[in-house]
Amino acid sequence: RPDLRLCDWFDLIGGTSTGAIIAAGLALGHDCAEIERLYRTLSPRVFIGGYRIPFLQSRFDPRKLEREIAGYLGDVTLGNAPWKTGFAALAKRVDTGSAWVLTNNPRARYWLGDPEEIAAQPDAALRRVVPNHEYRLARIVQASAAAPFYFDIVPIEVEKGSPGAFLDGAMTSHNNPALMLAMVAGVPAYGFAWPYGADELTVVSVGTGSARPRSPAWLRRRLTLPAVKAVAGLTSALYDSSQQANALMQWLGRSPRPWSINSEIGTLAGARHGFPPMWTFQRYDAPLEEAWLKRELDLSLGEAKLLRLRLLDNVGDIDLLLKIGALAGERQVDAQLFG
């Protein structure tokens, strides 16, 4: 079926950071070719110009990212966008130190309704809330993708006259959003309340090219410097949270093709937890590591090249990154999982 879209199969598509951009497009009914074209045009336009005022401003002009995302998604809100399936985006609200997940589900607690319904709320705090359905979709996605250092904080009016300050959802424990989205699907408070079970819920997690943040010898000698320690620690924490999400999803569920978590626990195949599997889980990714790429994809890339591929603002290697993703998909994706 040439007209088949991922929104025809998935009932909820969500993401963090660049994943939120992709998820929004897929949930609106765009096909993968459209999203590939978006990244080919968006990346060179956004990641250009370098620093404005180093250490006082973000590296790139956030207005460019805002303009590209708005042009892609249109001037729609979470409530009136022409959705084809469920959508979720994750972001970090830094002024309150909280992790937010925003969905297009009208049964979500803060979706709320018309002004009369809001005015009738017995909770005074709820009467001040700007309903989730009024949030501009492009603003939500921009907030989820606003990587610190690269882009500015994104303000979103969450209470009347009081904007919240948001940045990249990767700054939460949901850098890999698989576990959080599994909760969104089943925990009644989020509004979906789908049943759990390996034959009831299938969760597909797609990475964007992971890499274990090993420190080269020259950097290890500088790990005593406070700034170096801080950056190394944050980078490692992001990787650790992603791996932990994979570990929990595989341990609590059934995984047809499990990933190795680490050398100690392996894939967790056969690990017991005392109750039936909560879901079927499948992870797809293309680790940007020399040994894996050679072993799995027969690609020989030097460490210097891999260091460049891992950079968020690398716009010169889009073709190579797409090639890696396509090769990984050919080897990993089994159509039987999708019925």
Predicted regions and their residues:
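Extended charged low-complexity segments that act as oligomerization/scaffolding linkers
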Residues: 11, 54-61, 122-126, 130, ...
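Active-site gating loop/helix substructures
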Residues: 48, 84-187
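Extended hydrophobic secondary-structure segments that form protein cores and membrane-embedded regions
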Residues: 8-17, 86-92, 165-167, 198-213, ...
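Catalytic-loop motifs flanking and including active-site residues across diverse enzymes
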Residues: 18, 22, 65, 137, ...
